Amino acid sequence: MPSRAATSPLNVQMMVVLCIVCLALQAVAANATRSKNNVPRRFPRARYRVGYMFGKRSSSETYSTNLINLLSRQLVSQEELRAILEKQPILLDEVVKILDRNDDGYITVADLL
């Protein structure tokens, strides 16, 4: 049979308060780790160092690279250039953009100089 000192109301109250404090601390600690994981980050992928939006290029790649590849051969005859520009009007647009240096929609003598 337990002694009277072990079951006194003061000891029971202390045990109850101690249990409540332990449970409250455990709940606060669990909530803190859970909220730490749910914090919205400005750069969520920075933790993994994964590139974002730097993948393979699709068909949206500009055709100016094709024009540069064409001109990198350094020597293209007029007939070759005409044939290529007739087949690919997008390249013709790129040539016009290159010639129109001030982007006013007109090719002037100042643009050609």
Curated annotation (Swiss-Prot):
Tissue-by-tissue expression: Seems to be specific to the mechanosensory neurons of the central nervous system.
Matching InterPro entries: EF_Hand_1_Ca_BS, EF_hand_dom
Record keyword Nucleotide-binding present: no
Residue numbers of Phenylalanine amide PTMs: F54
Coiled coil, from the record: none
Main localization, broad class: secreted
MF-aspect GO terms: calcium ion binding
UniProt-annotated location(s): Secreted
Keyword Calcium tagged: yes
Keywords: Amidation, Calcium, Cleavage on pair of basic residues, Metal-binding, Secreted, Signal
Name assigned to this protein: Sensorin-A
